[in-house]
């Protein structure tokens, strides 16, 4: 080991990188690839055009050694915290964690003059707003100010045979005729019409009803009335029929309307198709659709990064179960289009669920009933693990673990109105040394939860220590026979194998999928994949294609795709290629030092600077618009 350290020092491995072969908390990269911060950025800047600015972004001091050791020493005492506090008094505090006050540029900001949708839809009727329309109606003026196309091929036109964005598409040259008409490939359109499409969209009529509060939640009100009358009995196969009061019984109302002699003389009610009693008799637990996913690979519901294009990437690499991003029940009940977009399901997602966040039984139960009759999912998950203050201070997320009475009402209420299994994702607890999961798991089993996913960290802990898999093993025994999935620190097939030995029913992959979405392939094939930089770029290119299909190919769609690509790159840059490591596998808590890859693209992908992520996005989506600003959500580094 001493010889390796000497070689590293001679090859420039010392200096700012400060990486030794055995340094704890740092990824063990081979000596011939390690370098310093200055040489790393000089190498990247050398490829830029002559005359470009070669400033090295300023960066705060490196993390103290004591703080890096805390990643592995879960039982560290409070001395390291005192050392860190004293260190921060001497030097300016470096921004870290979430960037809560980051500048947020909406994609519409980059499209100042937008064409009226009536012109895009090629409708025969004129614009309903007339002169009061705030959009542009002069096509010639729009084309004069429109930026140049980003490429010669339109993903939507090639995939679906028609681009609905017409002349506003940033690749419009691929499908505009000589007179500016939008071309259509009839054969491709006919073929795509027979294929399944993306589901779980929000209907405009339903959106208006939600905004005007005209939606009836009869089943939810019945369930809530049962909850207020007292504790409900434990759900068991013997409980068959939900009790209905006469005023809520549809059969009773019908008999009152046609009762007496007039009922015998009147004509029979015409029927069409089979008559069911789903509105009167709810499904028994044994009649509900079962969620049998034991042993399958579960992609975690990842806020911001777990969007539909990213889930398609993970499905292609072997993910079995997917779940939408966390959706707030109050926003869904208000008909917010952006929140309903989180529920969309691609046809490739064969086992798919949605995750709800809420703090009160009434809103959660009503939202569950709404989703039960409007969208197509295989399960509904309750978020009891969100640690952010915005959710926690309102009583949702992790706070539900300390509000067992409300938690019980939420679970029982939702379970009564849902026809699909109900699952829960939770943490070990709120405080770092006070675990609560082992106490709640038997209760959740009695309340009717079909499956629980346990993240082996508390709210206060966040990612400052390794996940507590021994505690997850203990909870798996307590939860039996209810299946329990484990989550935390899985970045290789060895990590997955060790996790399965704890007795869990399966594993959930979260950050590991962000760092390397091909992790699912590695787990299933039990091998390390030394993926090349060109293959990784192809994955990013596929993501941009999926993003343009999902968010659109106009300026707003392109910039929204770019934004989510950059957020993903803030995680992808932490991956260290297999061929560069001295020891396999890479640990998720090991910080990658400065290193030079086997080619320029591999080095560029290892950069932790947002300016370099922008360069990668420009390879795939063209140049950024003027005034572009990006500050990653989970990284203390900005590009302006």
From Swiss-Prot:
Annotated active site: 386 (proton donor)
Zinc finger (C3H1-type) stretch: 110-140, 148-178
Job of this protein: Catalyzes the synthesis of dihydrouridine, a modified base, in various RNAs, such as tRNAs, mRNAs and some long non-coding RNAs (lncRNAs). Mainly modifies the uridine in position 47 (U47) in the D-loop of most cytoplasmic tRNAs. Also able to mediate the formation of dihydrouridine in some mRNAs, thereby regulating their translation.
Residue(s) of cross-link: Glycyl lysine isopeptide (Lys-Gly) (interchain with G-Cter in SUMO2): 406
Molecular function via GO: flavin adenine dinucleotide binding; mRNA dihydrouridine synthase activity; tRNA dihydrouridine synthase activity; tRNA-dihydrouridine47 synthase activity; zinc ion binding
Highest taxon of source: Eukaryota
GO biological process: mRNA processing; regulation of translation; tRNA dihydrouridine synthesis
InterPro entries: Aldolase_TIM, DUS-like_FMN-bd, tRNA_hU_synthase_CS, Znf_CCCH
Protein name as it appears in the record: tRNA-dihydrouridine(47) synthase [NAD(P)(+)]-like
Record key words, sorted: Acetylation, Flavoprotein, FMN, Isopeptide bond, Metal-binding, mRNA processing, NAD, NADP, Oxidoreductase, Phosphoprotein, Repeat, tRNA processing, Ubl conjugation, Zinc, Zinc-finger
